[in-house]
Amino acid sequence: MSDAPYPVLVVAPLVIHGHEVEAVLFDAGGIFVIPDPHVVSPLLQYYGAVADLDRYHRAHYAGMAAKSAAGSGERDWSEYNRAYVESVGVPSHDCEEAATVLDRTRNAYIWRHPLAESVAALRALHEMQVPIGVVSNATGQIESVLARSGVCQVGDGPGVPVRIVVDSHVVGVAKPDPLIFDYGLAVLAGIDRARVAYVGDSVTMDVHGSRAAGLLPILLDPYDDHDGADFLRIRSLLDLLPPSTPPHR
């Protein structure tokens, strides 16, 4: 985890809900990619789910809210699965079987459907010269998936250039263990970790983990599933940008 050869840039800090931020690290799943609805939808339609792909976007966050409410760890997706299939309209009498099908289908490699709005926000941050990177619980695939999906890559490429993509499988430590964030912070030399935001979609993994690491946790909560929470929430990654920033579509 040696310091990367990046210059210390003097960039006006972002101000997010009153907090000055000099760099931003992100989760990957639920932030830039979600389980591909083109894969999941046909499987769940067999059990009565709707075909509207937008509902599968909402279903992911319903699932994550249920998972967080249960305090489930990284390996327990049972609450996520049930909330997901309910959200896409599977009748109650078929939810158990549909949730089992989802569980056996939702592998690491179908977390590949890019969220265009999030990618646009990431590009805007890059163009503002805000140091950015990714820290994700994954299985060794996330750097390739993000690049192949046109989201981001380290250095030049078709996606947004980022400083680092940390994969928990590769580094051998996973959220909510705060040590994983040290790998991302290693390329942010000269920046106080208290002025580094971490944006994720899980209270248990992302908010608790990054808070323990001394970062500023921010939850992406597009459907306001966590009203009254004691941490910062945004409905879109575009909310990270100054109001005068033009959209990047």
Question: Language-model features: where?
Answer:
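Asp-based, Mg2+/Mn2+-dependent phosphohydrolase catalytic module
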Residues: 1-26, 93-95, 119, 123, ...
